[in-house]
Amino acid sequence: MTDVSGKIRAWGRRLLVGAAAAAALPGLVGLAGGAATAGAFSRPGLPVEYLQVPSAAMGRSIKVQFQSGGDNSPAVYLLDGLRAQDDYNGWDINTPAFEWYYQSGLSVIMPVGGQSSFYSDWYSPACGKAGCTTYKWETFLTSELPQWLSANRSVKPTGSAAVGISMAGSSALILSVYHPQQFIYAGSLSALMDPSQGMGPSLIGLAMGDAGGYKASDMWGPSSDPAWQRNDPSLHIPELVANNTRLWIYCGNGTPSELGGANVPAEFLENFVRSSNLKFQDAYNAAGGHNAVFNLDANGTHSWEYWGAQLNAMKGDLQASLGAR
């Protein structure tokens, strides 16, 4: 009887957590959001280009914000969150990232668009409130875009980094798993690290529905489909260790610091994804991983103030790891 009662209580706790998460995710920061930092946008006069890069896979040209780090420079791909806009990348809207990385020897690449995409190749057309389009973001980021940048802007097509917030944190890790020569460095900031497990698929579906009206089943099929496991970083730790991919993993504890981000949605969501990051760290260490920075103990909420601070903090590590000159 005690065992049964314990199971009932545990199940009740899971239901309460799931209900709270389901209520919080849509309409809040949706695995992506957060308030802008005080220093949003870089100063005028920087050599930032607005490229239109053709994508046969997606049947259209994709806007890419770009700042060169010099001929044959390594690249840092800055990936946006669930609520990515079609005008500018969130890293540019909410931080002076181009200014921070000016003359760093690193080319900064910010693809624009891809709301709710997880930067993945979707099974079906991405149909939302604005209509239907083709999402083949993995193909674009790992084939079409690096080839175009190599041919037209002298950017190294290999030895790059992918850094993403929230939704795109897991995407950065997955890109490095399946394309280890291109992405030797992956930065994940405030991501849900086990999206295929537990209530992950359901909660992601709710958030995607709120952020553009998209369906998770159009992306990776039902939760039983292997695509969910393919795109789950926690299930690919052995590959990350074997490839010796350099990792930078950040997640705050849900408590705001002097940086800001003091609002209930951002606090709740950061605390919600935190446990998956702690489990990822434990599994990585158990697998013999030794090439990662884990920043999981500091105060921080699900907001740009903290993601910007992490991008600033990892600059030297990126330069050293990618061989910037």
Swiss-Prot record:
Membrane listed as a keyword: no
Signal peptide coordinates: 1-40
One family name in Pfam for this protein: Esterase
Catalysed reaction equations from the record: 2 alpha,alpha'-trehalose 6-mycolate = alpha,alpha'-trehalose 6,6'-bismycolate + alpha,alpha-trehalose; an acyl-CoA + a 1,2-diacyl-sn-glycerol = a triacyl-sn-glycerol + CoA
Location of the region described as Fibronectin-binding in the Swiss-Prot/TrEMBL record: 98-108
Keywords assigned: Acyltransferase, Disulfide bond, Secreted, Signal, Transferase
Active site as annotated: S166, E270, H302
Record InterPro entries: AB_hydrolase_fold, Esterase-like, Mycobacterial_A85_antigen
Keyword Signal belongs to the record: yes
Record: residues binding substrate: L82, R83, S166, D194, F272, V273, R274, S275, K279, H302, S303, W304
GO molecular function: diacylglycerol O-acyltransferase activity; trehalose O-mycolyltransferase activity
Top-level taxon: Bacteria
Main location: secreted
Disulphide bond pairs: C127-C132
Cellular component GO terms held in the UniProt record: extracellular region
EC number: 2.3.1.122, 2.3.1.20
Compartment annotation: Secreted
Chain's role: The antigen 85 proteins (FbpA, FbpB, FbpC) are responsible for the high affinity of mycobacteria for fibronectin, a large adhesive glycoprotein, which facilitates the attachment of M.tuberculosis to murine alveolar macrophages (AMs). They also help to maintain the integrity of the cell wall by catalyzing the transfer of mycolic acids to cell wall arabinogalactan and through the synthesis of alpha,alpha-trehalose dimycolate (TDM, cord factor).
Record-stated family: Belongs to the mycobacterial A85 antigen family.
Name of the protein: Diacylglycerol acyltransferase/mycolyltransferase Ag85B
